Amino acid sequence: MSLKNNVIGASIGAALTLTPTLLERIEGIEYEVYYDIAGVPTVCSGITGPDVIPGKKYTKRECDALLIKHIGVAQRYVDKKVKVDIPVTMRASLYSFTFNVGTGAFGSSTMLKLINQRKHKEACNQLWRWVYYYNPKTKKREVSRGIKNRRAEEYAYCVKEL
């Protein structure tokens, strides 16, 4: 394995170590399913989708396993799409962001385009565009204070080593 591959592997490993801590700080941990601000069934540290079974009480071990699984999906996608070297904390921020918005949203984002153009600060600034949710009650897009707080955490990580 080349030195460059070793460095990239170490960077990814370090980012993967940071990401669960970041997500747990942002999301907290809920062992019982709840409905988030957009009405989506959610559990553990922000897990959504088919792994969430309403009415089930999850254990810490189950939450840890789900978090690793879902971070892994985000990590593999980010690592495949980012074509340039980026700092460890920026990579952790992107894992968290992609975990939150999904791979499709990240893959088609201006943020990704800017990253691959090596415009890292501008890419980090794109996080502030992603603070909206669809409110099922008003049927409108609205700013979420919780999502803004999340983006502030992700932004701090994103720019930390620039």
Curated annotation (Swiss-Prot):
Main localization, broad class: host cell
EC id: 3.2.1.17
Membrane topology: Single-pass type II membrane protein
Function: Signal-arrest-release (SAR) endolysin with lysozyme activity that degrades host peptidoglycans and participates with the pinholin and spanin proteins in the sequential events which lead to programmed host cell lysis releasing the mature viral particles. Once the pinholin has permeabilized the host cell membrane, the SAR-endolysin is released into the periplasm where it breaks down the peptidoglycan layer.
Single Gene Ontology BP annotation: defense response to bacterium
Enzyme class: hydrolase
Name listed for the protein in its UniProt record: SAR-endolysin
Reaction catalysis annotation: Hydrolysis of (1->4)-beta-linkages between N-acetylmuramic acid and N-acetyl-D-glucosamine residues in a peptidoglycan and between N-acetyl-D-glucosamine residues in chitodextrins
Pfam families per record: Phage_lysozyme
Active-site residues (renumbered): 27 (proton donor/acceptor), 36 (proton donor/acceptor)
Protein family per UniProt: Belongs to the glycosyl hydrolase 24 family.
